[in-house]
């Protein structure tokens, strides 16, 4: 039986009932073995099972026990690495094809929710990304140009349009994406798992993959109490992959971020946030939030490489909310929880075949809900003989993220990013002051 319950969260409190899946005991055979029961592993297993492949998935804890069951729930195109940087590095054509692959991921998620007949999993449509600094007169032109270059459908909103929806002086212009939406991620993961089983796939919880050996033209994946012999193995364990593949596990950096859900707020919330879509800001370590359950605020934010839970997490999150919406000063936090994202140093996912029959689908950072589906689609196509989608990701290797030393270095980088957010805002406040006097 699977170990433990889900960690306490609003998602766990509102989740669907799901069976405990048995541990893998003894040796079994499959076409494909998947390590990790988060969205990367679940989408991969489902897409392959849809193609008639015999799939076995092993998960150390429970389905979507990691980031996939605890995140902000935003589904949208793009990647954790900024599009402008991708264009500089790869050129326009390649960046456009990468963006298109992320749009494929969005569609896979949308179509799966439709196919499951679960409209309640889809909790709202559209997204606003608001700037905390004035972006100047050319913001609209720059935004439209970037959208055109990428083949994207996002569009600029002025400061007045933004503040009409979000009653805070913190925000200036924003980017409106009509193609994004937001979901109940844990229930979506549980629905994916049920669908894999309907398609004949086998899921094992409480089962850690511990070692991997070549056996002729197949792989032997050893687990805590058993083993799988398979032609292909897909490693989708993100930042907690562990000893099953030491090099790949070191190539993904664990970065913590936090989510809180308030108690029910009443009409004050609707007065402050007149928008049922998702919201985030443009900072490197920004806030992301949405209204759930009618009048609760689900608020995510902060990043750190310290993966332990801070003792005063609820107060920290409440302070973050009130700093943007001072009119909500009386709110109370009902749930707060941490989650671990997996980042590669280049901030792009690691997707592809690293040895014959050994695949990776990992390192989705803070942009994983659609991108895991995009990655799974690329890996599935690769396993079935078309490597072109996986090749899109080949410039982003599985370089070393550095273990404890790399983590300290990454923490310094994050502090620098947060400092530059702070300087941007300070400069903005000084400019505003100058205009007033
Ligand atoms: C708090 C938070 C908020 C976020 N908000 C958003 C958001 O709003 N939108 C968005 O797009 N992204 C968001 N993200 C990122 C997104 O959740 C992740 O990118 C995505 O869920 C990653 O999926 P995954 O399957 O790669 O990893 P995970 O969900 O972490 O799954 C990996 C699984 O593999 C298992 N595993 C690892 N190693 C082994 C092993 N050796 N044997 C067996 N099992 C193993 C783990 O137990 C785990 O369950 C957020 C992340 C967090 C933490």
Could you tell me what each predicted segment is?
Residues 1-32:
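Extreme N-terminal leader/targeting segments of oxidoreductases
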Residues 92, 119-129, 161-195, 199, ...:
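Helix-loop-beta segment of a Rossmann-like dinucleotide-binding subdomain
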Residues 50-70:
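Glycine-rich FAD pyrophosphate-binding loop
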Residues 307-309, 314-430:
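C-terminal catalytic lobe of FAD-dependent flavoproteins
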Residues 78-160:
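Dinucleotide-binding Rossmann-like beta1-alpha1 core, especially the glycine-rich loop
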């Amino acid at each position: 039986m699977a170990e433990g319950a889900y960690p306490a969260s609003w998602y766990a409190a509102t989740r669907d009932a799901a069976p405990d899946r048995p541990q893998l005991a003894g040796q079994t055979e499959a076409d494909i073995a998947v390590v990790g029961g988060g969205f990367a592993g679940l989408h991969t297993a489902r897409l392959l099972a849809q193609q008639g492949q015999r799939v076995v998935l092993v998960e150390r804890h429970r389905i979507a026990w990691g980031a996939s069951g605890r995140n902000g729930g935003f589904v949208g195109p793009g990647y954790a690495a900024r599009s402008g940087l991708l264009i500089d590095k790869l050129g326009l054509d390649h960046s456009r094809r990468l963006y298109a692959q992320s749009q494929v991921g969005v569609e896979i998620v949308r179509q799966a929710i439709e196919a499951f007949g679960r409209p309640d999993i889809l909790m709202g449509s559209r997204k606003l990304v608001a700037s905390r600094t004035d972006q100047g007169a050319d913001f609209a032109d720059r935004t439209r140009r970037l959208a055109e270059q990428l083949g994207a459908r996002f569009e600029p909103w002025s400061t007045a349009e933004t503040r009409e929806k979000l009653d805070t002086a913190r925000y200036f212009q924003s980017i409106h994406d009509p193609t994004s939406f937001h979901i109940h991620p844990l229930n979506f993961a549980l629905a994916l798992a049920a669908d894999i089983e309907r398609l004949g796939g086998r899921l094992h919880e409480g089962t850690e993959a511990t070692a991997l050996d070549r056996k002729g033209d197949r792989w032997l994946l050893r687990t805590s109490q058993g083993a799988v012999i398979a032609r292909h193995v897909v490693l989708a364990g993100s930042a907690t992959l562990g000893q099953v593949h030491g090099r790949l596990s070191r190539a993904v950096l664990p970065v913590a971020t936090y989510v809180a859900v308030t108690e029910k707020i009443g009409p004050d919330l609707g007065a402050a946030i007149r928008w049922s879509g998702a919201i985030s800001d443009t900072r490197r370590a920004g806030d992301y939030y949405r209204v759930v359950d009618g009048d609760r605020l689900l608020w995510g934010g902060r990043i750190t490489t310290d993966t332990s839970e801070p003792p005063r997490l609820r107060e920290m999150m409440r302070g973050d909310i009130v700093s943007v919406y001072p009119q909500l000063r009386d709110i109370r936090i009902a749930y707060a929880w941490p989650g671990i994202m997996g980042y590669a140093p280049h901030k792009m996912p690691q997707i592809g075949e690293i040895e014959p029959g050994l695949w990776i689908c990992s390192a989705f950072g803070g942009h994983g809900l659609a991108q895991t589906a995009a990655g799974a689609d690329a890996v599935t196509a690769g396993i079935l003989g078309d490597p072109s989608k996986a090749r899109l990701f080949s410039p982003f290797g599985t370089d070393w993220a550095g273990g404890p030393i790399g983590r300290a270095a990454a923490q310094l980088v994050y502090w620098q990013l947060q400092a530059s957010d702070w300087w941007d805002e300070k400069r903005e406040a000084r400019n505003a002051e100058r205009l007033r006097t």
